[in-house]
From Swiss-Prot:
Protein's recorded name: Ribosome maturation factor RimP
Protein location: Cytoplasm
Function: Required for maturation of 30S ribosomal subunits.
Organism phylogeny: Bacteria, Pseudomonadati, Pseudomonadota, Gammaproteobacteria, Alteromonadales
TM annotation in the entry: none
Pfam family, one: DUF150_C
Organism, as annotated: Alteromonas mediterranea (strain DSM 17117 / CIP 110805 / LMG 28347 / Deep ecotype)
GO cellular component labels: cytosol
Length: 152
């Protein structure tokens, strides 16, 4: 996770949790005047549009006071969705048995992209099976990770 996302997570997590939601993670996509701050939230009973609106108001208020982003951006608050982003070790633990797509910050075995089944996750390492071969990936080296939805 980049420094800005880490700072934003620390800043926003208490406010999101105060509303009864889990802050799954944050993405800041820089795109000139059209930068986007994505805030992913979850709840054991699911997420509604009203939940997203409530969290958006809370997050906006915090960001207005703290002003951590110097450029213009649009704020998006949503549930993680079927292709759930994976930000923390906890998310990989919850994804054991599922297929995930990950991109590493630093290449391993001359590759950065892995798509496979999560076998285990412990002590900061994710074990992923890709085409019958196992890889041990450090969570700290994962730049981006998502669950790959399967339709049976």
């Amino acid at each position: 996770m980049a420094k800005l996302e880490e700072k934003l997570t620390e800043m926003l997590e208490p406010g999101v949790e105060a509303l009864g939601f889990e802050l799954v993670g944050i993405e800041f996509v820089r795109a000139g005047k059209h930068s986007i701050l994505r805030v992913f939230i979850d709840h054991e009973n699911g997420i509604t549009v009203d939940d997203c609106a409530d969290v958006s108001h809370q997050v906006s208020a915090i960001l207005d006071v703290e002003d951590p982003i110097s450029t213009e951006y649009n704020l998006e608050v949503s549930s993680p969705g079927m292709d759930r982003p994976l930000f923390k070790e906890k998310h990989y633990i919850e994804s054991v048995g599922e297929v995930v797509q990950v991109r590493l910050s630093m290449p391993m075995d001359d590759r950065r992209n892995f798509k496979g089944k999560v076998l285990a996750c412990e002590n900061g390492m994710v074990s992923i099976e890709v085409d019958g071969q196992q890889f041990q990936l450090a969570v700290a080296n994962i730049e981006k990770g998502n669950v790959v939805p399967t339709f049976d």
